[in-house]
């Protein structure tokens, strides 16, 4: 999965997919009542990018729905996965459940169209703080109460705080999560970061008793870093330059080992060679 970083305006969806992304990451900011408000990152946001593009969250979801609904004039067949980078650090820990409930309602109405031919992309809820695990339970409860528990088949999870992997496992246990787990590791593209924790996450993914299904590394803009991440065995790379990642994937060392994921590739299944 080539994951376009910080896609917060509807116009950027086409821009990133046309450069080779089959997945996008979108920032979600919350108001003080835990309502998802804008797709907005804010300053600072990494090197070489404008940090302030934004839409109202529900408006962005409507644009995203069109981009991921077959038959729509805006449909982008290649876009199969969306990571919502939830900026829930602005909330109190005890608001996490409310944030999850309100996020589920927004998605249900504006993206899934209440289960009536909505967008088809898989969704990853990416959470900054292990203490916010109730965001997951609130989200799940709401889809159930609203009569659409089947949509949870389209939803996965990620904690992106670079926490100790054993601690991440405990948070999922509390949230009652037993699958659909993506594990991110990374740092802003302005700074270097080693691959030690990525390798730990990959080892967990590939062990018989691991809880991780997929591992992705962020934010990668250089060919050399891309090669390092691929050599470590990641499933996804988040980038400001999807074309750079696509280029490296076409190199002879990688093209027989990796391919670009399509809608038929289940993002919740651990890949077995």
From Swiss-Prot:
Location(s) in or outside the cell: Secreted
Cofactor(s), by name: Mg(2+)
One GO biological-process annotation of the entry reads: killing of cells of another organism
Q: How is the cofactor bound?
A: Binds 1 Mg(2+) ion per subunit.
Active-site residues, Swiss-Prot/TrEMBL: 5, 41
Keyword terms: Cytolysis, Dermonecrotic toxin, Disulfide bond, Hemolysis, Lipid degradation, Lipid metabolism, Lyase, Magnesium, Metal-binding, Secreted, Toxin
The positions annotated for binding Mg(2+) are 25, 27, 85
Tissues in which the UniProt entry reports expression:
Expressed by the venom gland.
> Which transformation does this protein catalyse, written as a reaction?
an N-(acyl)-sphingosylphosphocholine = an N-(acyl)-sphingosyl-1,3-cyclic phosphate + choline; an N-(acyl)-sphingosylphosphoethanolamine = an N-(acyl)-sphingosyl-1,3-cyclic phosphate + ethanolamine; a 1-acyl-sn-glycero-3-phosphocholine = a 1-acyl-sn-glycero-2,3-cyclic phosphate + choline; a 1-acyl-sn-glycero-3-phosphoethanolamine = a 1-acyl-sn-glycero-2,3-cyclic phosphate + ethanolamine
Q: Which domain of life is it from?
A: Eukaryota
Q: Which GO terms describe its molecular function?
A: lyase activity; metal ion binding; phosphoric diester hydrolase activity; toxin activity
* SS bond partners: 45-51, 47-190
Pfam families with a match to the protein in the record: GDPD_2
Task: Give the EC number(s) listed in the UniProt record.
Answer: 4.6.1.-
Q: Which GO terms describe its cellular component?
A: extracellular region
The UniProt entry, under Gene3D superfamilies, shows: Phosphatidylinositol (PI) phosphodiesterase
Membership in a protein family: Belongs to the arthropod phospholipase D family. Class II subfamily.
Function description? Dermonecrotic toxins cleave the phosphodiester linkage between the phosphate and headgroup of certain phospholipids (sphingolipid and lysolipid substrates), forming an alcohol (often choline) and a cyclic phosphate. This toxin acts on sphingomyelin (SM). It may also act on ceramide phosphoethanolamine (CPE), lysophosphatidylcholine (LPC) and lysophosphatidylethanolamine (LPE), but not on lysophosphatidylserine (LPS), and lysophosphatidylglycerol (LPG). It acts by transphosphatidylation, releasing exclusively cyclic phosphate products as second products.
Q: What is this protein called?
A: Dermonecrotic toxin LdSicTox-alphaIB3aiv
Q: Native species of this protein?
A: Loxosceles deserta
